[in-house]
């Protein structure tokens, strides 16, 4: 015998209550209002958890943040369009989960669990959150089954076809603590971010390795080529020995710019604290020079002033001069986006924001799953071309006219 699907107890569905409904349209209208009311209650619960105290509680006095009213938002449900009130906090830090920003539909339980996981919450934390805020009982095993579905999505994303040409590709890595053969060790998630011909950024993939080496990056670049990348106009990298030669072996026409910010940090390692501010200001004259010739003169000036005291701080500039000054070949607008890896370092900072609650990961798959979800959240905001895109694209077309496919 089929089990009766009884979500609401019989005592709630009294004759008096049911007498309110004359047609199916009446029921649908009620369900739409109920749906909106439940979502608003869920959002209020999220705000309580975000602030750490309930509405009107004296605990919130002088806490540094408080409620700041609400704003209306239209959402689409299976019962039609509704308008609900989204609570705000005074510091503007509240990120709704049940009804995410920039989305017009509330989340299913599965999407809600994955969204919480992407925010850096552990399985046990999610179980507690679902029970206390959303009043949903969900076991840790059920939550694990849901989050494990992310692995397949991450693998499909990692293997997806890529564009044939990228104007710029930034390459860098971010280190995590990961359990490996019973020991917690440092592993790096290597990331490539490409600039597309429409001015939008795209994370091309992520690769996990124990240590950075030119041979490791050879595998990364080979993977990009296998997925359809035929040409990269400019690559931006850190100063890894042999990296430039590795790039040229896979993409021989690519120009490689070593990150100037990495170079500055490397030089400052040899400088005592009291001299760092002045030394850094003198280095700034090098990369802010109008052309490579003036930059070379500024490097000479730096060496005359500091070379006797800090010879190794100058030596790395000399040894990497050609790869550090590639950006002088390009107009100012392109220079600004290639002589640092700030873009990918900002990406790494946002990933850290999502993973800060994870002191270590039990496996490589766990790292990949968490970083993948973080990237999906971050890429939702990459909806606009980079600044001055029309001008920059025209410059690329003039410089690389035979290599850009319109």
Located regions from the model:
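Subset of Sec-pathway N-terminal targeting signals
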Residues: 1-69, 76-79
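Acidic/histidine-rich catalytic cores and adjacent linkers
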Residues: 3, 252, 285-406
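Short hinge/gating elements
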Residues: 20-33, 95-100, 107-111, 129-132, ...
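Electropositive nucleic-acid engagement tracts
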Residues: 54-57, 61-64, 121-168
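Basic, short loop/linker segments at the boundary and entry of helix-turn-helix/winged-helix-like folds
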Residues: 64-119, 135-145, 164
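RNase H-like nuclease fold core
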Residues: 87-90, 98-103, 136, 140, ...
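Conserved beta-strand -> loop -> alpha-helix junction used to position metal-binding or nucleic-acid-contacting
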Residues: 234-241, 246-284
């Amino acid at each position: 015998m089929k089990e009766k699907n009884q979500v609401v107890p019989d005592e709630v569905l009294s004759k008096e209550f049911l007498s309110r409904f004359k047609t199916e349209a009446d029921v649908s209208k009620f369900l739409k209002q109920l749906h909106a009311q439940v979502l608003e209650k869920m959002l209020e619960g999220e705000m309580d958890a975000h602030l750490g105290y309930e509405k009107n509680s004296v605990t919130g006095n002088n806490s540094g943040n408080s409620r700041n009213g609400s704003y209306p938002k239209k959402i689409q449900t299976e019962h039609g369009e509704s308008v609900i009130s989204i609570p705000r906090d005074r510091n503007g830090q509240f990120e709704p989960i049940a009804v995410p920003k920039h989305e017009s539909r509330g989340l299913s339980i599965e999407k809600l669990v994955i969204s919480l996981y992407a925010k850096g919450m552990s399985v046990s934390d999610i179980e507690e959150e679902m029970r206390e805020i959303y009043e949903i009982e969900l076991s840790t095993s059920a939550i694990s089954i849901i989050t494990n579905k992310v692995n397949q999505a991450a693998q499909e994303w990692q293997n997806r076809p890529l564009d044939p040409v990228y104007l710029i590709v930034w390459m860098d890595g971010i280190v995590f603590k990961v359990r490996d053969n019973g020991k917690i060790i440092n592993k790096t998630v290597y990331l490539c971010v490409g600039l597309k011909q429409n001015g939008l950024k795209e994370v091309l993939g992520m690769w996990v390795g124990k240590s950075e080496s030119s041979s490791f990056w050879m595998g990364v670049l080979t993977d990009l080529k296998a997925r359809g990348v035929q040409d990269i106009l400019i690559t931006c990298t850190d100063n890894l020995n042999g990296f430039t030669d590795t790039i040229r072996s896979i993409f021989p026409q690519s120009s490689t710019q070593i990150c100037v910010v990495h170079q500055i940090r490397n030089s400052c390692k040899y400088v005592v604290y009291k001299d760092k501010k002045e030394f850094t200001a003198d280095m700034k004259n090098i990369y802010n020079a109008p052309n490579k010739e003036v930059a070379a003169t500024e490097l000479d000036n730096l060496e005359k002033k500091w070379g006797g005291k800090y010879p190794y701080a100058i030596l790395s500039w000399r040894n990497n001069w050609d790869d550090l000054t590639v950006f002088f070949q390009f107009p100012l607008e392109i220079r600004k986006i290639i002589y640092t890896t700030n873009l990918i370092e900002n990406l790494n900072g946002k990933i850290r924001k999502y993973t800060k609650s994870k002191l270590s990961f039990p496996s490589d798959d766990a790292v990949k799953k968490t970083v993948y979800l973080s990237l999906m959240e971050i890429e939702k905001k990459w909806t606009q071309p980079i600044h001055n895109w029309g001008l920059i694209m025209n410059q690329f077309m003039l410089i690389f006219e035979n290599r850009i496919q319109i």
